[in-house]
């Protein structure tokens, strides 16, 4: 490249090596990035990476599938860019690290969209066709968004849970876990959403504040004599009264079937204006105050003495349909934190209630379950039939009051379960569902699912490490997994069930395979259109097709089966090295994947789990529409560049919350500019350097150049150790320090004089350029995983013959003799230079000098510092960026100092140094001897700097 012509005549007369580069100072990222995305696609860069990586050890990051609905948001951007950084850094570390993106396609949100657009009365076949089309459209939209962020992957062949092959393999996975004995059907309270009309997974439940009625209700004595004896009395002092419960769900009272007391809690019989009331002794004072009563404790007894006593239903006086009694069952889960120390039990609407009643001999057919799937009571329920439970709440309170059973009615604000899709309250509701049993003995007599999964958690590496305890606790305490859903757009639980007994067809495993073969050809629609007689002949008179679909968490939770070992088995492998998702996935994809793999394979589907936090604004608030603090990644990419989003993510400790604001983005942009300016300097000063022709061997380099390369190699080793542990923010922090301080603040600063003023092909300049070449080789590669657009842009300027930086591996720096000692020596020199710089700044502030080149310094130093400084000889002035420098030996560190004086000599017009020999050549009165030699003779000789 030719030298850039300067405007001033002296520079034209005495040229310096000021070079230019096509790598511009301004990134113009919003304009250039989309061109790079097109370029990568057109030239098949991802495919070239795959071809280059063939035969290397595999590293598999398995993509947790985003849901195919809606635009990508900042959380998506964080997740996909983190994955991209992992994959790129692993490829550059010498692995074969493919990236196959995927999408979760079935389930409620898409079905809701179809209902919104086309109504609820569409035939199932049309729902499925429209759902497929909708999901496909959403995938294309999201895919474009992810590509725009610089994410490289198999975009032409992603996995989709709705692809026929994946749907078929999921049915086969279901067959396997049935064969292994994990699946059963039963009546159980499950999370139920009235708007979905379906059971919900634990991960689909969120908690929001809600105000509900809270009531204290009296269940009148049904067995006064037995009650008296339980309290050690011959008889009750009076007939009126009963046992008191507290509840926030009045709508469950019509279905009450029992009362729960703790066996070891002491209960009191309290004489009040409302009769004799039974409650926990330690709650008497608070309850009397709440009820507005005065009371006297007549007797006390332990809870276990009251077991099996019966009390009248509180609505018995309101309608004959409630003339029944409720027995006392003992339960360890009863507490005295609030209420009366007595829990009313409606087994259809509470997990503990259900478990307690079943343990006391209640059968499924005994359980009263009047709430239908849409939230209304059955028409035949006395007093409240046909009402929604929420509308019934005040009417139940009124009926209790009229029956004389209400002691208190207030409102209570509490955190309550809501559907994550509809944002509406949900309930526990006993329904007949298909479950995976956590503590069921599998067919082979081995460990239970819970035991296997807990062992698998222990065998998994967690980043950050606290994730292990969190997932362990979730698995240890979770209920059985409700596998079934009552929807259309989902993979069918393709069973034939006996119409009378509910038993599975004896040929179920064989029949599931037959269905899977059909689904492989026609999709899940094949089950909808299948005539049972095709597969089971006359048995169709006895068996009916099961209409349930699989929980969508089973879809994504079995991707290790139908993607890693199914649709993409040629690219991927089982188990994956890493699953990487937001921290909510401990109860979502990490969780469901662990359970399915534990059932299918007896192990986790991943070797490591990496968790990132959520995005918050600059004040630490969660992003929400109501606060108006959301940040759209598209908007930021189009205004500042996707590179700024990538750098923000890479520079943030993702193990906690990721804070973002305009102020934070401004700081990130400034950091980006500093890195870009460093790259521009490197590329400009290498633009006339041909490594094959101009490079010097390391032993011929100047000492500071050997130091710079040794230091860069040591830094790279640190960075690669961070990359290996997925620690990106220390990589960014160290690289920013490297660019601004180690290079910009020291090495490049020192180098400018040599690069600009030495003869273009001199050993001094070629030494500097050879070192810069190696530094640039290494720097661009370690930047590439996160600053992908910029690293590629710079790489193509640096090595135009190379197709892409992403097929490279991390740089092998040349060996530098005595590298550790060299780095230690120059670390010492930089420390002294810092003291000199401070002294120069003080002299400048006092108007004793202008630039540092106007100064001559004397450094008094002792010991190793003196030795290091003295070893540089006349080159010390270049390191200190002064026109003259001397070093004087002193005995003690306390005697060390820096003296600054203004030079008495003239300033060279070309190099700006103040030297005694300026004008020594009469024909060149403004030129120093050094510049004269560099321009017209053999050039100056340097050894250190």
Curated annotation (Swiss-Prot):
It is found in: Cytoplasm. SUPFAM superfamilies: Anticodon-binding domain of a subclass of class I aminoacyl-tRNA synthetases, Nucleotidylyl transferase, ValRS/IleRS/LeuRS editing domain. Its EC number is 6.1.1.5. A motif ('KMSKS' region) lies at residues 622-626. Its cofactor is Zn(2+). It is an enzyme of class 6 (ligase). One of its GO terms (cellular component) is cytosol. GO terms for molecular function: aminoacyl-tRNA deacylase activity; ATP binding; isoleucine-tRNA ligase activity; tRNA binding; zinc ion binding. Keywords: Aminoacyl-tRNA synthetase, ATP-binding, Cytoplasm, Ligase, Metal-binding, Nucleotide-binding, Protein biosynthesis, Zinc. Binds 1 zinc ion per subunit. It catalyses: tRNA(Ile) + L-isoleucine + ATP = L-isoleucyl-tRNA(Ile) + AMP + diphosphate. It holds the Pfam family Anticodon_1. L-isoleucyl-5'-AMP binds at residue 581. Zn(2+) binds at residues 908, 911, 928, 931. Catalyzes the attachment of isoleucine to tRNA(Ile). As IleRS can inadvertently accommodate and process structurally similar amino acids such as valine, to avoid such errors it has two additional distinct tRNA(Ile)-dependent editing activities. One activity is designated as 'pretransfer' editing and involves the hydrolysis of activated Val-AMP. The other activity is designated 'posttransfer' editing and involves deacylation of mischarged Val-tRNA(Ile). Monomer. Belongs to the class-I aminoacyl-tRNA synthetase family. IleS type 1 subfamily. This is Isoleucine--tRNA ligase. It comes from Burkholderia thailandensis (strain ATCC 700388 / DSM 13276 / CCUG 48851 / CIP 106301 / E264).
């Amino acid at each position: 490249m030719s030298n850039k012509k300067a405007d001033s005549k002296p520079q034209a007369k005495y040229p310096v090596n000021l070079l230019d580069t096509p790598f511009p100072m301004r990134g113009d990222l919003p304009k250039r990035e989309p061109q790079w995305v097109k370029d990568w696609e057109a030239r098949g860069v991802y495919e070239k990476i795959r071809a280059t990586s063939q035969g290397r050890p595999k590293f598999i990051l398995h993509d947790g599938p985003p849901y195919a609905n809606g635009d990508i948001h900042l959380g998506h951007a964080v997740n996909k860019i983190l994955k991209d950084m992992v994959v790129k850094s692993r490829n550059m570390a010498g692995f074969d690290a493919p990236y196959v993106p995927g999408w979760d396609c079935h389930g409620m949100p898409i079905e809701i969209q179809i209902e919104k657009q086309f109504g609820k009365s569409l035939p199932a076949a049309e729902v499925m066709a429209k759902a497929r089309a909708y999901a496909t459209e959403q995938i294309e939209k999201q895919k474009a968004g992810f590509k725009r962020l610089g994410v490289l992957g198999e975009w032409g062949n992603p996995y989709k849970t709705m692809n026929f092959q994946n749907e078929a393999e999921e049915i086969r996975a279901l067959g396997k876990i049935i064969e292994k004995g994990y699946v059963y059907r039963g009546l159980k309270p499950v999370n139920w959403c009235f708007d979905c009309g379906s059971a919900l997974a634990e991960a689909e439940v969120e908690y929001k504040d809600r105000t509900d009625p809270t009531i204290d209700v009296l269940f009148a004595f049904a067995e006064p004599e037995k009650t008296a004896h339980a309290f050690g009395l011959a008889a009750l002092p009076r007939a009126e009264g009963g046992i008191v419960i507290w509840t926030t769900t009045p709508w469950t009272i019509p279905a009450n079937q029992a009362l729960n007391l703790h066996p070891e809690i002491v209960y009191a019989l309290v004489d009040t204006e409302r009769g004799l009331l039974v409650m926990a002794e330690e709650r008497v004072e608070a309850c009397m105050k709440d009820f507005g009563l005065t009371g006297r404790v007549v007797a006390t007894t332990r809870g276990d003495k009251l077991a099996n006593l019966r009390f009248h239903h509180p609505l018995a006086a309101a309608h004959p349909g409630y003339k029944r009694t409720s027995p006392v069952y003992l339960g360890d889960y009863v507490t005295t934190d609030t209420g009366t120390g007595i829990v009313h039990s409606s087994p259809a609407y509470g997990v503990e209630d259900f478990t307690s009643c079943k343990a006391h001999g209640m059968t499924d057919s005994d359980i009263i379950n009047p709430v239908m799937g849409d939230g209304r009571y059955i028409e035949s329920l006395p007093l409240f039939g046909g009402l929604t439970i929420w509308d019934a709440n005040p009417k139940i309170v009124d009926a209790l009051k009229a029956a004389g059973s209400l002691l208190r009615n207030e409102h209570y604000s509490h955190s309550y379960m809501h559907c994550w899709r509809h944002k509406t309250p949900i309930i526990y509701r006993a329904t007949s569902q298909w479950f995976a049993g956590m503590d069921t003995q599998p067919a082979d007599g081995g460990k239970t699912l819970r035991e296997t999964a807990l062992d698998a958690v222990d065998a998994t590496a967690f980043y950050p490490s606290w994730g292990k305890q969190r997932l362990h606790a979730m698995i240890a305490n979770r209920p059985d997994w409700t596998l079934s859903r009552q929807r259309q757009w989902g993979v069918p639980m393709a069973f034939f069930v006996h119409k009378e007994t509910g038993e599975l067809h004896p040929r179920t495993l064989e029949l599931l395979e037959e269905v899977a073969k059909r689904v492989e050809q026609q999709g899940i629609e094949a089950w909808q259109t299948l005539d049972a007689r095709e597969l089971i002949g006359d048995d169709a008179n006895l068996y009916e097709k099961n209409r349930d679909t699989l929980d969508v968490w089973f879809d994504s939770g079995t991707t290790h089966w139908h993607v890693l070992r199914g649709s993409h088995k040629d690219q991927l492998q089982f188990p994956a090295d890493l699953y990487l998702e937001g921290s909510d996935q401990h109860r979502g994809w990490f969780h469901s994947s662990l359970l399915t793999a534990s059932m299918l394979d007896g192990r986790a589907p991943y070797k490591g789990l990496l968790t990132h936090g959520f995005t918050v604004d600059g004040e630490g608030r969660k992003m929400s529409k109501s606060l108006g603090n959301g940040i759209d990644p598209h908007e930021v990419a189009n205004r500042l560049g996707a590179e700024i989003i990538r750098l923000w993510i890479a520079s943030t400790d993702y193990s906690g919350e990721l804070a973002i604001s305009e102020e934070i983005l401004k700081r990130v942009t400034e950091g980006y500019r500093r890195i870009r300016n460093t790259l521009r300097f490197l590329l400009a000063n290498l633009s006339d350097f041909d490594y094959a022709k101009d490079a010097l061997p390391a032993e011929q380099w100047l000492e500071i150049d050997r130091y710079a390369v040794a230091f860069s190699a040591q830094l790279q080793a640190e960075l690669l150790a961070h990359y290996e542990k997925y620690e990106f923010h220390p990589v960014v922090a160290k690289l920013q320090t490297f660019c601004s301080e180690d290079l910009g603040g020291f090495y490049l600063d020192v180098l400018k004089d040599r690069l600009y003023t030495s003869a273009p092909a001199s050993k001094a300049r070629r030494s500097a350029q050879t070192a810069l070449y190696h530094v640039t080789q290494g720097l661009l590669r370690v930047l590439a995983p996160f600053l992908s657009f910029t690293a590629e842009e710079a790489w193509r300027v640096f090595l135009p013959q190379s197709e892409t930086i992403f097929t490279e591996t991390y740089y092998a720096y040349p060996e530098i003799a005595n590298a550790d000692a060299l780095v230690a020596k120059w670390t010492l020199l930089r420390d002294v230079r810092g003291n000199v710089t401070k002294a120069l700044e003080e002299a400048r502030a006092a108007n004793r000098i202008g630039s540092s080149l106007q100064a001559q310094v004397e450094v008094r130093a002792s010991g190793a510092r003196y030795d290091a400084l003295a070893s540089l000889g006349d080159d010390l002035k270049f390191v200190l960026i002064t026109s003259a420098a001397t070093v004087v030996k002193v005995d003690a560190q306390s005697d060390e100092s820096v003296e600054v004086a203004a030079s008495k000599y003239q300033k060279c017009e070309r190099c700006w140094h103040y030297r005694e020999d300026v004008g020594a050549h009469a024909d060149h009165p403004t030129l120093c001897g050094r510049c004269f030699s560099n321009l017209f003779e053999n050039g100056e000789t340097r050894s250190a700097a």
